Regions:
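Active-site-proximal, substrate-binding regions of enzyme catalytic domains
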Residues: 1-41, 52, 58-66, 70-381, ...
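Acidic beta-strand-to-loop metal/phosphate-binding motif
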Residues: 382-386
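Short helix-capping/hinge SLiMs at alpha-helix to coil transitions
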Residues: 43-49
Length: 537
């Protein structure tokens, strides 16, 4: 698979290096121009001509990376200036119109072929292992997205963030659970394959930098302040899903290791208090009703423990996570609460009060920055959230050309990689792949809170019989987080919402009827076989 090979190749080039531009981008373009030269015949002419579009197409075709044309021109020029005097005399390499065009009599570049061939073998071994795993689990490849699509989803998300736009990321038909299960399978007994997966993940991060033209020369300062959103705090405390705990805790370590400061806002403490209070009021050991409740059962904590920590929540969190708390002035909160952003975000929320918290948090960051920032590395304050819809909303409400205030864990991990690529490559690839696994699980399995939200919405907006309600929830229990969220987005259009609900009911009814019929047929066949055996006896 070209994409897997490409990402593994990029990561291998960056290994033990500090300058990604010189050690990754430049060799990539030298190899692309060499490939272009090999495809062109110089028999009819003494020289070969090409354009920026030609090299852009080669990079996309051979590596699956869409490099902006201005970056292509810059790197074409860089290839020319990187040549020694002897090479310039041999190749007669010239560029024109600031990198728009080039010509040479001959050009070849073989310095990285050994690395490329090795990474191609590694990528092919991983792909083959994935295909073998699907067969062992009796899963059809036709119904499962490719492994490159799983990794590419991460690159697309990162490219969206670094471009500062809500880029359209095409939904892939099928679940990515097989990919997560495969990674968990090889992590224990097939360490070499898992290392390849980590390397490919890191390559996808580097590809996102190249696709969006991230300024690699700009360095990240120390003492940057990171405010944590509610869910991030709960994950760090191991009070959310089990798979979210380690990646979040590792991210906090990475922030500190790169000179960052972790803080919470007082409004976030208040929001966490309400969430824990809800878990206390509805606590059940046998049938957990909230994610916090579910986590307590998993880690062996009871209702009394929850009551205890909620009574001293601020001091508990400060001690557990070693963080400071910042307050927002009442006058500022009043100002933030009246912003247009709050009203717009409320329209997308079941729980309207959460919109005030989220908008106030990123507007506080905006104020603390004291002006618009154009480079990600120069932002002194961030609001770290796991809420993709909030992150997208923030991007839509920022000033074009400037950096948004929210950042998701996988985006922050990738950004921190630029602090010291040589030192942080292994750690970032480990944390990042774990974050991708956790994010995939979150997208596949709806939280207790999301199930409760859709339940409330159905009861308020749809008139269903008891039978239809039970059939509907048999279906919803199997739906992914993304599908349930899309259903919730239709609440404002009652007709469309009800239409979608009844479509789910009919599909589930048909599915159950088919299952029942198949069961009857199997029972009938079983009885016929038994009857034949008795007749023979």
């Amino acid at each position: 698979d070209n994409v897997l090979t490409s990402y593994s190749f990029l990561a291998a080039l960056s290994e033990n290096e500090t300058d990604i531009y010189k050690t990754v981008y430049l060799p990539l373009f030298k190899r692309a121009i060499s490939s272009y030269a090999a495809k062109k015949s110089s028999k009819e002419s003494n020289s070969i001509q090409g354009t920026d579009i030609d090299i852009q197409s080669i990079i996309l075709e051979e590596y699956g990376i869409e490099v902006p044309i201005l970056i292509v021109r810059k790197l074409i020029k860089a290839v020319g200036t990187s040549l020694s005097k002897k090479e310039r005399n041999i190749f007669k390499f010239d560029t024109f119109e600031d990198g728009k065009a080039f010509q040479f009599t001959n050009y070849n570049y073989f310095s990285t072929e050994e690395i490329y061939d090795r990474e191609r073998r590694n990528a092919q071994a991983l792909q083959q292992a994935f295909e073998d795993y699907l067969k062992s689990e009796n899963l059809s490849e036709k119904n499962i997205p490719s492994f490159s699509q799983f990794i590419d989803k991460n690159k697309c998300n990162l490219s969206s963030f670094f471009s500062g736009k809500n880029c359209l990321i095409h939904d892939v038909e099928g679940s990515f659970m097989a990919h997560v299960n495969f990674l968990q399978h090889i992590e224990g007994g097939y360490h070499y394959l898992y290392q390849t997966a980590e390397r490919i993940y890191l390559g996808s991060v580097i590809a996102s930098f190249l696709e969006t033209g991230v300024d690699l020369e700009s360095k990240i300062d120390d003492n940057i302040i990171y405010y944590l959103d509610t869910q991030i705090v709960l994950e760090a405390l191991d009070l959310q899903k089990a798979e979210d705990t380690l990646p979040t805790q590792e991210l906090l370590k990475l922030i500190r290791a790169t000179g960052g400061k972790i803080r919470l806002l007082d409004i976030t403490i208040n929001e966490i208090h309400k969430i824990i209070e809800l878990a206390i009021n509805n606590y059940s050991k046998s049938h957990p009703t909230t994610t916090v409740n579910e986590a307590c059962v998993r880690i062996g904590k009871n209702k009394t423990w929850l009551i205890s920590i909620n009574g001293k929540l601020e001091s508990f969190i400060k001690a557990e996570l070693q963080v400071d708390i910042d307050g927002i002035l009442e006058t500022k909160m009043n100002l933030y609460s009246r912003s247009e952003d709050v009203n717009l975000l409320k329209q997308t929320r079941i729980h309207k009060s959460t919109a005030i918290h989220d908008v106030a948090a990123y507007l506080h960051v905006r104020d603390r920055r004291e002006g618009n920032i154009r480079l990600f590395q120069k932002a002194k304050y961030w609001f770290v959230t796991a809420n993709k819809k909030l992150a997208d909303f923030n991007i839509s409400r920022k000033t074009n050309g400037f950096v948004n205030e929210t950042i998701m864990p996988e985006e922050l991990t990738s950004l921190l990689f630029l602090k010291n690529p040589q030192k942080l490559a292994k750690k970032v690839s480990q944390i990042g792949l774990n974050e991708l696994i956790a994010q995939t699980l979150s997208e596949e399995y709806a939280s207790k809170e999301l199930i409760n939200e859709i339940d409330i919405a159905i009861k308020e907006s749809a008139d269903l019989s008891a039978e239809d309600y039970n059939i509907l929830f048999s279906s919803i229990a199997l739906q992914s987080t993304n599908k349930i969220q899309k259903l919730l987005e239709e609440i404002s259009d009652k007709r469309k919402f009800n239409e979608s609900i009844h479509n789910l009911i009919e599909k589930e009814r048909t599915k159950q009827a088919k299952s029942k019929e198949e069961k009857i047929q199997r029972q009938k066949q079983f009885e016929e076989v038994n009857h034949e055996k008795l007749s023979l006896e």
